[in-house]
Amino acid sequence: LSVGNGPEDITFDKEGNLYTALASGDILKLIFDNNAFISPTIIANTGGRPLGLKFNADGNLIVADAIKGLLEVTLMGDVNTLVDNYAAEPLRFVDHLVIDQSGVIYFSDASTRFTIENYKYDFIEASQTGRVFAYDPSLDSLTLLVDDVFFANGVALSKDERFLLINETGKARILRYDLHGGAGEGATVFVDNLPGLPDNLVWGTDGIIWVALIALRDPLLDGLAEKTLLRTLLGGLPHSWLPEGKHYGLVLGLDEDGRVLHNLQTADGYTQITTAISRNKKLYLGSLHQDHVGVVDIKNLQ
């Protein structure tokens, strides 16, 4: 499905129409008609870099914008800011979100040190300043749930809404945060030592947790934590010179206990996958730099 550069996340409305957001700031709608998607139309532009997006109960899009913060976007094109700071400090890298049945929005802020324009430095520095928040629109209240995360990325709610899954990209693992636990309990490890760097994750209606891995792990980046001098040297390089994981297409399907059910890979097809959403026996894929939404038939997966 051709859409334009960087369809990082994907969501659907009740009629089955597809929505995505691009590097240009555009939010697109692809109408589903006669078993096919019609060419996209622009419904809004955030003026930033929209990443995650989900519909709320009012039929508006809640958007995690890396530059502008947490936004509410109407289908008429109005863009309203919900959250753009915490403790009087701007949110630098709002990344992904999920909404519970009561309307509370859980969202990630990847780093307090770096923005989307220079995010690679976060992996070099290993600042581990990512956070996850809960925002209640009915009370206009913002609560910090988890901090000290090495690049907080995708978030997903369990089906019973008792816990939250958080992709910790910099450590190639998934965290679990108990929403009904005692104060100060923090997050625990749900899945460790993933083969790539996890971006978004979605708990699908099929009961499978679909995890998109944007790149394979880089041995150089894996070993930087103990190499202070090398980190310092790399930190002085232009951003475009910094290493990044090998471009590869990789999506994992996990069960509720974190066991791998499906392992979908391609070395030269749709790569740098940022999200994977299952719908009607198909897997819809988003990417940071591709110019189209990928579609994979999964009806024959066992």
Question: Language-model segments: which ranges?
Answer:
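Sequence-structural signature of mature extracellular/luminal beta-sheet repeat domains
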Residues: L1-Q302
